[in-house]
Amino acid sequence: MATINQLVRKPRVKKVVKSNVPALEACPQKRGVCTRVYTTTPKKPNSALRKVCRIRLTNGYEVTSYIGGEGHNLQEHSVVLIRGGRVKDLPGVRYHTVRGALDCAGVKDRKQGRSKYGVKRPKS
């Protein structure tokens, strides 16, 4: 425990909280343009071809974003919305594309967990 005299000479330093999603700049989502759409492989022990895209955001940042769901319609110059949220087995991927917003279509034939994939309620 520091004495009052020590605290007068040198006050306590606040811890700086580092953001996990710096490119969002404290916004819930950001818009951007796809510069490259490709697949990449996850870290061990997983094996797949994960769909990701490189995005130039409106604030000038260039980030890599994961495209969730089965199948997508994104290509170069597509305008997309991204949100925070990393992909644990893809190093360097800290953002998700929002399905069903702007140029990114919702997942086709999705019946459950629809809100996460931008799908409207089906006509029963």
Swiss-Prot record:
A single GO molecular function, which one? rRNA binding
The family database entries (PROSITE patterns) matched by this protein are listed as:
RIBOSOMAL_S12
Question: Which residues are reported to carry the modification 3-methylthioaspartic acid?
Answer: D89
Which SUPFAM superfamilies does the record associate with it?
Answer: Nucleic acid-binding proteins (SSF50249)
**Gene Ontology BP annotations:** translation
Keywords, alphabetical: Methylation, Ribonucleoprotein, Ribosomal protein, RNA-binding, rRNA-binding, tRNA-binding
Q: Carries keyword RNA-binding?
A: yes
One GO cellular component term of this record is: small ribosomal subunit
InterPro entries, per this entry? NA-bd_OB-fold (IPR012340), Ribosomal_uS12 (IPR006032), Ribosomal_uS12_bac (IPR005679)
Superkingdom, natural source: Bacteria
Pfam families, from UniProt?
Answer: Ribosom_S12_S23
UniProt function note: With S4 and S5 plays an important role in translational accuracy.
Give the UniProt family note: Belongs to the universal ribosomal protein uS12 family.
Q: How does it assemble?
A: Part of the 30S ribosomal subunit. Contacts proteins S8 and S17. May interact with IF1 in the 30S initiation complex.
- The name of this protein is Small ribosomal subunit protein uS12
